[in-house]
Structure formats: structure tokens, C-alpha cells
Amino acid sequence: MSARRIATSHGRLMVEDTGGSGTPLLLIHGNSSSREVFRRQVEGGLAHGCRLITFDLPGHGESEDAAEPLGTYTLGGLADAATQVLDILGLDKVVVLGWSLGGHVAIEMLSRIRGIRGLVIIGAPPVRRGGMAEGFLSSPHLRSAGRRHLSRPEVEAFGQAVFGKPVEPFLSRAIVRSDGRCRERLFQAARTGEGVDQRLAVERSSVPIAVINGAADPLINLDYIDTVTFPKLWNGRCHRLDAGHAPFWHAATEFNLLVSRFMADVMEGAA
């Protein structure tokens, strides 16, 4: 596993790459977390047969904060940062996996990269512009997701909501480290309808999409996701694992198996 910082127009971003000749899979983390959340994928069975690329979004983990937060800290800005990472790595064909915020970034990338072979979205309901109330459950923790400054109790409560109990120490550190301007700007942009209509984007996409959520996710409206028409929904259904908002961590074995099967189907043209 090699790690290096890559210079992009959104700042220097920390990228880790397992290398090899396997199918490239870009993993994008969520709001106020870091690439470390995918530890059980990088160290688990998913790394066999795939080239895994994880990175810290601008304003997160070991990446730099954005010099121009108004432009970078939007779904479009973060999607552009991810696209630049792929360009610099020389990857023109890739499967993209995104969790929570990362899932929304991945959907935003659909119109930017012709070489996206498949999409895996976790905890990321594709909502219309101004449609957050449809896709998300009413939760006090969503307010924390959009606040610049968080108290220690808010950090703990937010961590429990997005990752479950116990809150892993690395996640608490990631929340504290993250640039609060990113949280604030993302929600400002969502309220004003910036970015693509995500429901329309997936409903018009010919890219195979795997939808994997936790059956006990406290933040998203699973029933809403079932109303979305994905033209190439993998296995013809949305998968629900025995977990909360982070099934890739709490149900890692089953999750990794599903993603491995999806990757194989994509490469064989069977997805």
C-alpha cells in the first residue's frame, strides 16, 4: 500500500493505493471522516483482485483544507477533486464506491467521467434538488452535519449517528480535524439547490449501480430509496445489511463479499 500527497487545484490530497493490475475501485468517505473508515476493505478480502484507491477529501484527514472553500466544499467541487485524483493516477476506467457524502460525490461524478464502469452507493439517497426531506430522516444529528463548530458532546453524538457505538478513536479524531467550513458550505449549497439533480442523474444513468445500506440506518429514508428507478440496479434490488449507517464497518465480511461480486459482474458485463 503506497501513500502520497497529490497536488490538485483543491489542495494537496493524501492518497493511498494498493496498486497492482486488479480493477480500480475508488472509495470516497463521508462528511467529517477520512479514508481510514475503509480499513476493513483495504485489509480485508476486498483487496484481493481489486486495486483499491482511498483518499482524504479536501478539508479532511491528512489532506489540506481548501484555499477556496466556496468552490471546493460543494458536491461539484469535491467531485472535481476526486476526478483530478483519477486523472493524475492515469485511471480512465474505474468503479466508484461512496459512503454518505461520498456517495453523493460519486453520483455527481457520473456526468464527469465517461470511464465509470460501476457505482456503489452506501447511505446516500439520491434526492432531487431541494429534496433532502424526502431522502433523510428527521434527526438532530443532521444539524451537526452542517455546523462549522462542534462541541465535544456534539462530536461524540455525531460520531455515534454516522458510525455507531463505540465511536472509534480514529473517527473522533477525524471529526475534530475536519474543516468545519466544509460542513457549513455543503449544507448551504444543498439548501440553494447547487449540484446535479441526483435522482434524475441515477434514473437516467446506464451505469450499473449497487445500492448497499444498513437496515437500521438512523439517518436515511430506506423506503424513499426503494422508490428510485435505477435502470441498471445490480441484482434488481437494494441490499440491506444488519448494520446502521456504516455497513462496510459493522458488517464488513458480508459487505466485502457483495462488492467483490458486483466488481466481478461489472468486469464480465453481467451487472
Give a label for each model feature.
Residues 107-111, 115-147:
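Flexible "cap/lid" loop of the alpha/beta hydrolase fold
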Residues 130-131, 148-203:
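Conserved alpha/beta-hydrolase catalytic His-Asp/Glu region
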Residues 27-30, 100, 214:
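Glycine-rich His-Gly loop
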Residues 98-102, 106:
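Gly/Ala-rich beta-loop-alpha elbow adjacent to hydrolase catalytic centers
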Residues 45, 206-243, 249, 254, ...:
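Conserved loop-alpha-helix segment in the C-terminal half of the alpha/beta-hydrolase fold
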